[in-house]
Amino acid sequence: MSQFLPVTKKDMEDRGWDQVDFVYVTGDAYVDHSSFGTAIISRLLESRGYKVGIIPQPDWRRKESIAVFGEPRLGFLVSAGNMDSMVNHYTVAKKHRQKDSYSPGGKMGLRPDRAVIVYSNLIRQTFKKTPVILGGIEASLRRMAHYDYWENKVKHSILIDSGADLISYGMGEHSIIEIAEALDSGIPVSEITYVAGTVYKCRDLSRTYEPIILPSFDEVQADKQAYARSFAIQYQNTDPFTAGTMAEFYGTKGYVIQNPPALPLTQEEMDDVYDLPYVGNYHPMYEKDGGIPALEEIKFSLTSNRGCFGSCSFCALTFHQGRILQTRSHESILKEAVHMTEEKDFKGYIHDVGGPTADFRQPSCQKQLTRGVCKNRHCLFPEPCKNLTADHKDYVSLLRKLRDLPKVKKVFVRSGVRFDYVLADPDKTFLNELAKYHVSGQLRVAPEHVSNQVLKYMGKPSHEVYEKFLKEFDKANKKAGLQQFAVPYFMSSHPGCTMKEAVKLAEYVRDLGFTPEQVQDFYPTPSTLSTCMYYTGIHPLTGEEVYVPKSAHEKAIQRALMQYKNPVNRELVLEGLKIAGRMDLVGYGEKCLIRPVRKGHGDSKYTENAGRNRESKHSPAPKKTIRNHHTRKKQK
């Protein structure tokens, strides 16, 4: 049986070790599961003979907390965890979240804001010369100068502010092994400048071969046009086969150099990574706190792929995992599934089989495997490329094998299917079997919007494509003798979304006959195409000016429009309708979103506090004919 890696000096000594080779400092609790980057990288290093100790969620107010194992022989590895620490801590409205799913019992406050910078500087206070290598999503997406939504300014590469030596960006397996081997052979960390998938600092470019010179930090900080140009160059250099080395100048601090991305893992390498001896659970020290909430959903889920060629503008996957699909073999996935069914708390349900996009099981075309993805076009947007290979046969076969396993009652597909890719496949077997076997009443899909203008900036297919998918899904349900529904995810206030487009989305929600309980407001996270548009007002790939709903108030209005039935949103909805010139939607008709203010009740305070006033003995009972309520329409 696998045992957890050391988290204390006693754990280290119990193994007979005097010193660890690497100390992995993470902002997450320690969960030894393949869905956690800390587990993957530390287990991979262990498999190559390196001794790794884990310091999960150290107290950043005490420098002693970073010295649990003393000085490591080779270096410190630092990650904020599975999520960016700022996204983990704050909503898009910049309000503190109440729960941290990656901490014991969901407790908030066990990691600092900007965890990578804080941890790295904490290490430097005690271990001034020990190599520090950054990794994980927070460091990866801040590897060059970037717009920071929380401070509303352009910030340095995280390498500058952290005082670290290297960034291992992306998924990191190839680069971390190469870094470890270099350090182990005695190469100084300052000379490890050749590893693909890394970022390093240097004083000049004398040892950098034909770099692409990006606009300097001072330029991108001062000029939004320069920022957009820089982003476009970086966006077009995310493929390991075609990317160049990029250099960004920081004045007296020298240069930050980004090497091309590491090659994607082969299927054999993917299998090896997921076959490492993970315990599959959180460390027992968290038992008293109720465990780690993030594990609950993924404990009985299976990762089948990495990478995504969907290229949604608001998604960071292009910068982090890349566009080239990497998959595990059926044998590897089935082996994990069988092991899963033997867990004492397995109830017969596999919660998900997928990855960034569940139904991607092969590269979009064969060219990707040898020449990389196209720099000047996308695989699915604005419509599927003529060279796209849309084929679900392998995924269908995998799902069938999983369904046939003993002890398995049902296999769900919850990580999302790309509906335009489903439609591009002329064989309807997958859609038919998805409806029949892998959905439980509702299929969650992500059209994101209904306005083709907004969808263009999102990098999503037109609304007509989504409507066609709904018809095909309905046919598949009828064929299976089931009544199931597609539940759409929508996003408000994305760049390009004017108030008129927001009202159009509200009308669509009205016609669906349901009110979304949760609305995803666009969140400008580092290194996405949409965030570049948000900050600059420019589409970096076309130079086109883009309307951006930026103020907190306008974002609140667009969000409220999607939940127009909620009485507390009435004033915001009314304001949005006025701005859009759509006062025809205020009235008593079935197409209206809100009712007019009642005569005799003064100003809008009555409606803002409608619920309270109805209960007041001083208020007359409301007439049924003018309730701020819409009858839920029956699903067709």
Whereabouts are the PLM-identified features?
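N-terminal pre-triad scaffold of radical SAM enzymes
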Residues: V25-D28, D289-A316, T341, Y349
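Terminal amphipathic helices with adjacent charged low-complexity linkers/tails
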Residues: R61, S190-T238, A262-L265, I292, ...
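Flexible glycine/acidic-rich beta-alpha junction loops that bind and position SAM and/or redox cofactors
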Residues: D84-A93, L141-R143, E173-E178, R203-S206, ...
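Acidic, low-complexity intrinsically disordered tails
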Residues: R371, R377, L593-K636
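Conserved, mostly hydrophobic/aromatic
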Residues: D165, V273, C308, I333, ...
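Glycine-rich beta-alpha loop elements in corrinoid/cobalamin-binding modules
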Residues: G37, P56-G251, Q258-N259
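Amphipathic alpha-helical packing elements
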Residues: I158-G170, A560-S604
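Conserved SAM/AdoMet-binding glycine-rich loop
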Residues: Y24, I55, D59-W60, H339-V487, ...
